């Protein structure tokens, strides 16, 4: 087991509203911020003094380049981030309720991260892995799901812990049973999980 936290999954631009407590159509301005739950975990781990790497695929577009730059400036190793011209970087418009809860409107049909394939995952990436962290957003029926399976297999071979944040985003799943079955499919791989009250 090494000392680097590796996360795999989506990175996107969150468009944060200038106003809270109102519907999307009432918001007059949004600010673009780099986000995505797995990327945020890398950022938090780095702030706490740890070493982190992030595996994702971004669109070869201004949003993708912004995310890559923001990750690097946060101290996250971006050597495992790839780019594609086959799809754009994912976007999410956010509305904020007065109690702090959020509603998301996603633009990723498909997005670049969804097209990241198992063939792109390399065993040597996990030589210094302390833990591998992932979420459910990237486990739909597209290539990134198989990339997760391969990453988990390599990480377990290297003795790394496996951490899972369900982070259920129901609007991204047309079939709620498929989401339920997919989460259950990955649970046997885990050492840690971190569901929120809304999950």
Where are these regions (language model features)?
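Conserved N-terminal subdomain of the carbohydrate kinase-like
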Residues: 51-134
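Active-site beta-loop-alpha junctions enriched in small/polar residues
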Residues: 109, 137, 167-169
């Amino acid at each position: 087991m090494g000392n680097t936290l590796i996360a795999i999954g989506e990175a996107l631009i969150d468009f944060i509203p200038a106003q809270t407590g109102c519907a999307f159509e009432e918001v007059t301005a949004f600010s673009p911020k780099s986000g995505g739950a797995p990327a945020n975990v890398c950022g938090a781990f780095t702030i706490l003094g740890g070493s982190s790497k992030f595996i994702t695929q971004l669109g070869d577009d201004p949003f993708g380049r912004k995310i890559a730059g923001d990750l690097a400036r946060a101290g996250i190793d971006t050597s495992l981030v790839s780019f594609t011209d086959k799809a754009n970087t994912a976007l999410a418009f956010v509305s904020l309720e007065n109690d702090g809860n959020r509603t998301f409107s996603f633009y990723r049909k498909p997005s670049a991260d969804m097209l990241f394939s198992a063939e792109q995952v390399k065993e040597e990436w996990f030589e210094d892995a302390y833990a591998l962290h992932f979420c459910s957003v990237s486990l739909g029926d597209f290539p990134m799901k198989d990339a997760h399976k391969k990453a988990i297999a390599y990480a377990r071979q290297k003795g790394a812990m496996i951490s899972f944040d369900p982070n259920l985003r129901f609007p991204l799943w047309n079939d709620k049973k498929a989401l339920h079955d997919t989460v259950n499919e990955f649970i046997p791989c885990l050492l840690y999980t971190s569901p929120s009250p809304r999950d």
